[in-house]
């Protein structure tokens, strides 16, 4: 524990340029080699070539190294996943040479720092053990000075197979803890998973959207840090109070010192418009860890706002640590000033930012890649930009992966995207022992301290589906029966302590202005979990439960944090992993890249096509129809959630992205190509939207506005037949109240459609602000397959990198399918065209050769 300092001198003055110099740091990210651990005789016998050293990447994984050396095939291609499984079942060694000078050895400390060891690692320096690690989510540091010598030094990191390391213990358990997904490769017996017992990204053990690639390696940067006297171990900035006239902050510095001495902490604040303020505190520190705080005050603060509600001004807070009159360390934070609360009154679940109730619109983010070390800033930037560009304002970082790099949250800060941050628990029941909780406590304390200053993070949640699974899932109920009342009490109490005390305590200590919930879904122990009445919901009756998509209309949850519907990725993405041969949904390669129901999920795609749409003409048309089904399902659900405001205050669909090229719930596939769902999100998440729901023989029209001021508008409902004739029109003026959803009409079929045949007629609901149509949706009384859709008669006209589509008749769900073209994607897609209507889409002219126009017409 740190030592909290008492009274100390506080000096506030006009800032001068910071003269801080960082501690000396030497990167250890180059020169690494990897081989099988000589002690792993079985692996060496099976793979003798890998007993010799080969080049390794840090940050990275041994799987990446073997792929680069062509020792194993790329698991993302074809059916290669099985061929890489032996790697995660073997023990490995990594080594590098570290050159140390006499000047370096003259420093007080030479710390080896590993930002990520994956996972059961032993670090030796010149043959002597320096440290052992057992948590991939933690940073590991140890002073290596006593083991180093002038000249070349060997750093050797031995990492055990996480599965084999834990398997003897798990196999000896009469009732092992329930995990997530059983292995499809026979390396773990069914129901005897090792993943619940390890602190490592859980998705790497396989999920219903991703492969089983149990990575091993130094997955984040490594370095040597030289320092004297004292160093800054942590630096964060807490917001104590915020008004329109003043922001009161506290800069918290954790100082690690060799001995008792006087130090000076200086904090320099740079405002968004370039003004500076400096505060300085002199204090006496003791040997060990010390907490030093520096109060700060900012007048006329500029508030950070979520996208769509204002700007995102950011402040820079730089800190220097001086000892013996010399600057010995420095740190820097970028912060935003905002208040956030979670409205929980009477079971509600809604975010209030700077006093404004925000309807959360967005999606769930899974890890960017099976190999996190190769994720680039550009990849993250592109995906977050894609989210913002379709009117999302929130991203949920799902709990089965890893805590993302600082750059991700910095991007979210700049874009105004709110982040829902799970702690990294993906669904498995957690061990009840105190040692496991202590390991997690250190992890959580470190991660919240690292990330807690980001204004984009508006909630921390303790886990994904651990608590709801414990309460509701059939396999958990069977487990509880097997272990009896005493076992249930022991396991249940352990989870309650972990999620309600340990993790909540980490947030309270390091980010006290950010709400916390013990899980998702959660009612915060106020009652049953995963209900419409209290807390957030994960709704999977549609898709996983094979229920009709219209079931989305049956309830108004308080916050829908998960719901989803699968589709195929783009044809170009499919060709990338399946090759040039014939394609079929039930082929080995397509089933290998479909993880739902162990590869049988493609039958679920066909089930919903049969239920709702026309038959596919060929495989490419099948791909199109799956994307139409996905877009229509999520459009229906998201608009319904928005129409349920203020009962419902958020809609986050599953999922935004893919971890590998696959058939999944993603709206943006692994190669960054937008599915029709992502284009649809731009429409159903628009700031002002019209919702027209047909249910029980009537159409309900609701107008939705996210604006903070009243908006004059008008809405129109037009009934047409398939020949294009207008059968009736209703139009009314309306004022959209701020932050609202208002039902303006409920019209029985006889009133709206008269005697028009359901298969031969449809309604067009439109919302106008001024002369601009801001939202449109079509209303059918039958499933699309039962509508008498005419030949749309679409004509295309090219002009440079733009193509204009003109429809002679109604065209539903128009897709510009560019096939195998990889040079760009349409600016819009998946839209409807009314008779005689034209739309111009930006698309590289080179796509003309492969372009196919698809619609729902037979």
Question: What is each residue range found by the language model?
Answer:
Residues 160-167, 322-328, 768-775:
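Short acidic/polar inter-strand loop motif in beta-rich domains
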Residues 394-414, 418-592, 629, 633, ...:
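Substrate-binding/catalytic cleft of secreted carbohydrate-active enzymes
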Residues 104-108, 148-152, 165-166, 299-314, ...:
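Short glycine/proline/serine/threonine-rich loop/turn segments at secondary-structure transition edges
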């Amino acid at each position: 524990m740190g030592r909290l300092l008492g009274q100390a001198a506080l000096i506030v003055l006009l800032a001068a340029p910071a003269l801080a110099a960082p501690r000396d740091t030497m990167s250890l990210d180059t020169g690494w080699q990897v081989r099988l651990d000589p002690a792993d005789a079985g692996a060496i016998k099976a793979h003798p070539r890998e007993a010799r050293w080969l080049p390794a990447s840090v940050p990275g994984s041994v799987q990446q190294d073997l792929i680069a050396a062509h020792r194993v095939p790329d698991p993302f291609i074809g059916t290669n996943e099985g061929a890489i499984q032996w790697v995660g079942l073997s023990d490995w060694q990594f080594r590098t040479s570290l050159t140390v000078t006499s000047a370096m050895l003259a420093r007080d400390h030479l710390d080896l720092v590993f930002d990520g060891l994956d996972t059961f690692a032993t670090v030796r320096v010149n043959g002597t053990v320096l440290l052992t690690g057992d948590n991939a989510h933690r940073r590991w540091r140890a002073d290596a000075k006593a083991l180093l010598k002038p000249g070349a030094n060997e750093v050797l990191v031995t990492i055990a197979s996480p599965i084999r390391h834990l398997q003897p213990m798990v196999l000896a358990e009469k009732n092992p803890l329930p995990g997530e997904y059983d292995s499809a490769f026979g390396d773990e017996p069914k129901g005897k998973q090792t993943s619940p017992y390890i602190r490592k990204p859980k998705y790497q053990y396989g999920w219903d959207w991703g492969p089983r690639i149990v990575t091993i390696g130094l997955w984040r940067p490594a370095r040597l840090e030289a320092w004297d006297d004292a160093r800054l171990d942590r630096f964060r900035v807490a917001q104590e109070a915020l008004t329109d006239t003043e922001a009161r902050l506290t800069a918290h510095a954790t100082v690690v010192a060799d001995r008792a001495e006087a130090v000076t902490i200086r904090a320099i604040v740079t405002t968004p418009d370039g003004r500076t303020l400096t505060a300085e505190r002199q204090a006496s520190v003791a040997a060990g860890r010390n907490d030093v705080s520096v109060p700060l005050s900012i007048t006329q603060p500029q508030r950070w706002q979520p996208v769509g509600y204002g700007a995102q001004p950011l402040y820079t807070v730089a800190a220097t640590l001086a000892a013996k009159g010399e600057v010995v360390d420095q740190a820097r934070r970028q912060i935003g000033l905002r208040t956030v609360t979670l409205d929980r009154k009477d079971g509600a679940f809604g975010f209030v930012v700077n006093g404004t109730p925000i309807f959360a619109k967005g999606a769930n983010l899974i890890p960017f890649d099976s190999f996190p070390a190769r994720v680039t800033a550009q990849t993250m930037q592109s995906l977050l930009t894609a989210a913002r560009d379709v009117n999302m304002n929130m991203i949920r970082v799902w709990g089965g992966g890893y805590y993302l790099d600082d750059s991700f949250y910095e991007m979210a800060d700049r874009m105004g995207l709110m982040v829902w941050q799970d702690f990294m628990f993906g669904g498995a029941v957690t061990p009840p022992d105190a040692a496991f909780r202590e390991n997690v406590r250190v992890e959580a304390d470190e991660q919240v301290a690292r990330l807690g200053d980001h204004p984009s993070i508006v909630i921390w949640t303790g886990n994904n589906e651990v608590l709801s699974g414990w309460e509701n899932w059939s396999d958990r109920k069977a487990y509880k029966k097997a272990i009896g009342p005493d076992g249930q009490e022991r396991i249940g109490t352990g989870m309650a302590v972990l999620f309600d005390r340990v993790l909540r305590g980490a947030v309270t200590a390091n980010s006290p202005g950010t709400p916390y919930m013990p899980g998702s879904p959660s009612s915060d122990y106020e009652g049953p979990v995963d209900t419409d009445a209290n807390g957030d919901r994960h709704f999977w009756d549609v898709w996983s439960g094979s229920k009709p998509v219209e079931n989305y209309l049956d309830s108004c949850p308080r916050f829908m944090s998960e719901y989803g519907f699968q589709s195929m990725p783009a044809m170009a993405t499919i060709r990338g992993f399946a090759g040039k041969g014939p394609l079929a949904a039930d082929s080995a390669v397509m089933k290998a890249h479909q993880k739902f129901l162990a590869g049988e999920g493609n039958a679920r795609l066909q089930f919903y096509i049969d239920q709702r749409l026309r038959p596919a003409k060929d495989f490419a048309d099948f791909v199109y129809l799956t994307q139409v089904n996905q877009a229509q399902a999520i459009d229906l659900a998201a608009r319904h959630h928005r129409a349920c405001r203020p009962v419902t205050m958020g809609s986050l669909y599953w999922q935004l992205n893919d971890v590998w090229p696959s058939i999944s719930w993603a709206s943006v596939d692994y190669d960054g190509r937008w599915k029709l769902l992502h284009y649809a999100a731009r429409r159903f998440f628009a700031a002002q939207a019209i919702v027209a729901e047909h249910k029980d023989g009537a159409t309900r029209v609701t107008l939705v506005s996210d604006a903070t001021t009243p908006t004059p508008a008008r809405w129109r409902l037009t009934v047409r037949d398939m020949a294009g004739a207008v059968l009736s029109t209703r139009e009314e003026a309306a004022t959209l109240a701020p932050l609202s959803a208002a039902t303006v009409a409920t019209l029985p079929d006889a009133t709206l459609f008269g005697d028009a045949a359901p298969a031969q007629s449809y309604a067009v609901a439109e919302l106008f602000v001024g002369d601009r149509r801001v939202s449109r949706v079509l209303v059918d009384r039958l499933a699309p397959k039962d509508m008498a859709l005419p030949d749309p008669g679409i004509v295309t006209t090219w002009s440079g990198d733009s193509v204009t589509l003109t429809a002679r008749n109604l065209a539903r769900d128009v897709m510009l399918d560019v096939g195998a073209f990889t040079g760009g994607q349409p600016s819009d897609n998946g839209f409807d065209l009314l008779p005689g209507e034209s739309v111009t889409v930006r698309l590289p002219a080179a796509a003309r050769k492969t372009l196919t126009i698809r619609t729902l017409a037979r």
